[in-house]
């Protein structure tokens, strides 16, 4: 009833790596049950007749140094319901493992490779996981992991996805210090709990996440000159705010404008100027 991808970002350095899961299903709020990830540890998707305890157990095994395959073996050995489970795991190094129990409903299966595990059950066919793998491998390895995961999820959805229909989707990505304000490791945590086109809606939300919850790169920062400050102060007042700081706070642009107003993100500048497609 679900298809998912678990992956680690490209590159050998775990200090800058991301781990994540993207999932879709004809199931209410699939993001509350399937994905889990911890930066510098790994990620897991547990599905089919999901044993949600797998999430904490697998991450604990990985944190103790187990590889993905060893962690998976330990989960299955301790679970009498293993034949009804489907699970994918990627460890800190990008080693991947997947299991599809013999009692999972057709079509059910998986594929693994360097840095990813893709699995699904009650699918329209094997072409779903094949399309997901092809899309993930064709995506830019330097792109944000969330974008690569959603490219795979979207490909699986287009290929047929869950044979029962569509209802929910989610994406979870972790990277050390990547959270809001750098205060935690949650790079992306988005869920579409009940929607007629959940994967499409998840793509829309990821665009908003990039704008509001992702820090500006050095290339995106535009120095705040006196002339630019005057222009933006006028925009703020025209929008009914007392000043530029008030506008930034009201519009939730804190991640895209310097606290001391020494720079502004070029996307925010485009929005302020009303440029087409800026949002």
Question: Would you name each region that the model predicts?
Answer:
Residues 220-257, 271-275:
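A short amphipathic alpha-helical interaction element
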Residues 33, 256-259:
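Short, solvent-exposed loop/turn and secondary-structure capping segments
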Residues 198, 264-268:
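Short, hydrophobic-biased amphipathic alpha-helical segments
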Residues 1-226:
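N-terminal nucleophile
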Residues 75, 153, 236, 245-248, ...:
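A general structural motif at alpha-helix termini
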Residues 259-263, 277-278:
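C-terminal soluble interaction/assembly domains
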